[in-house]
């Protein structure tokens, strides 16, 4: 008899201090606001006075961002490539919803959490600069890219250009397709690290043949930090009718770009890296006219 109607009950179950959550998140998003697409996804976040080029010297900005995190008193976290820490606001929200869902799982998950799924997808799409119907939330870059790799209708005579620098999970997925379906893998071996973009592009394009159907590109190579000239390779590939898949695990929310800037057809990333989302979150993007091909 405490609740007059179901809507009152549902409202009480939502994290009670959303305003505090947003205010705390502003410290983290303040750093992200240096990127061009944050304004579209989070219009309430003010633009910082610093530019993306001089923010490294803005002690006040980084002190503000640091205060949003629960840092270890004994360890210095230097590895943000594999997984980044989530800010306190995200951890508190995750703990709240986890406890709430375990009180009555089917009720809370479907009546409450599901209501936020589409707004979240729309915000992520805005951050990535693409229509929401082209993105899907998943668990990480590996799941996103594997969904595409194993879903593409490739035939035994088809060739896929990969690199010796691709992430092991992706390399193994392509090896699986080669063993199961007879897809031919052609390895590019660009001279890395290198500042010669044309040499990197040429290392890929010289592997293109009439049978090449797709080129797999790693946006940032985790071994050495090389930023690959994805757009140049993609343009060269499309000129030959070749599709482009981009592993953006290490670039989303780190480099200042939107997905269309890359000129690719398929793309996947992890959100628990530089976006600092809770562990086990990723994003998959497929160009609208290509979605039907992945099954």
Predicted regions and their residues:
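N-terminal secretory signal peptides
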Residues: 1-16
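Pyridoxal 5′-phosphate
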Residues: 16, 22-295
